[in-house]
Amino acid sequence: TTLLFMSFIGCSDNDQPDETIIDPKEQWSATLRGDGEILGAYPDLFSNYWEYTYNMNEYPDVALRIEGQFPHARYFSFSLYDDETGSAIGGINDHEIIPDEGSENPFVSTSEKDNRFTIYVVPASMDETQIAKLPSENICRVNADIKRLAICIRHYLGTNANGDKDEYGGVALPVIKGIDIHSLKEIQAPERTESNIEKVTGQSFSQKSDENRDVPFFLAPKGRYYPNNSTAYLYARTHVHADSVLIFSFIPVPLPRTVEEYEGAKARYWSICLGATSNTRSYYSIYDKEANAKEGEKATFIICLKQNSRLAEIQAKVEAQKQLGAHWNLFVWDSEKQDVDGKPIGDVIAIMYRNILPDKDWEYSITRMTPTEYKDDEGEPIDKVTDPDKQLAHKALGDYGPYGFKYAANDFLRDDFEEETY
């Protein structure tokens, strides 16, 4: 197994650069937008990604120095991958980054300063005595068997300093510099090469259980390709017909209210994301602060098609219930919407309940569940349930675990309608 280790060492370095560093936007990829309707594998619509990939075997004597400013975002991280396999080999989350001298980490304590950081990525060929001289407390070591390294930046809910949505989190992308591992002199960074990250797509397939009336949620296994190891997901999928609605209710994970509460939080962020199983792209999403939800109380999520003949009545009922204080949230899915390939996205929907930095020790953490593999030659997820109390969210987590039922639209609109419980 390939491992990446973090060590914390500091000293001074007075070497001057030998090369002019290019614009960092030219070093990193163009923004891989979660809401761009291009990425597969059900990305979160409120995330942005950038990758820098290079052939390590062509630069055996080069380490990387990544210098940047902490962005304004709910969550920020660096992830490192073996680009030949898509396997995660390490990374560092926002709150783990030691800031530069004179700066503060705004993901640890509230800070209005322009705070900066430096991260080194060092190959296995770099001597320990030279590593000890690097002037940073953030050292990422990459094993010798990695031939092509992909570094990925993730931002969730990036804004500018005023809190307005911003593609880059209100700061420039980090600068990547090359460092000669023998002299520690600054040299030109390795040339970025094409990465497999943009080629990742999820597998499209049909399931008999999509026609079932009940819709259970399972813990997703760790992603095979370029996963965010600091995120956990519950997933479900079903076929929503034009004359029906899908409803699921649960208590969302409680979240910190301030940066100072990040340490020890049950999670940093949650969202509900809907994607098309026809192409594994995401199209509709809602995140914690936008959702009609209250801490410690059940929130209800309703999905119906835009093509439902009683859509206006469904919308009116949801609004009326919200006015009465109900925590209802409505998704209107357009099954005729065309994807980037000109094909309709269809009416078989995947649902992802995402938690970032979930607390594994919390009683109701989704990470305490047993993962259930997606459909494969051995069957569908529901066929693989051998321990319901650990694999089905509503059994493992009680009211904190979602479970869905489909209803005829006519029944949902009755005055005496009541949501079923399991």
Model-derived regions, located:
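A compositional/structural signature for long, glycine/proline-rich flexible linkers
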Residues: 19-422
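Bacterial Sec-dependent N-terminal signal peptides
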Residues: 4-26
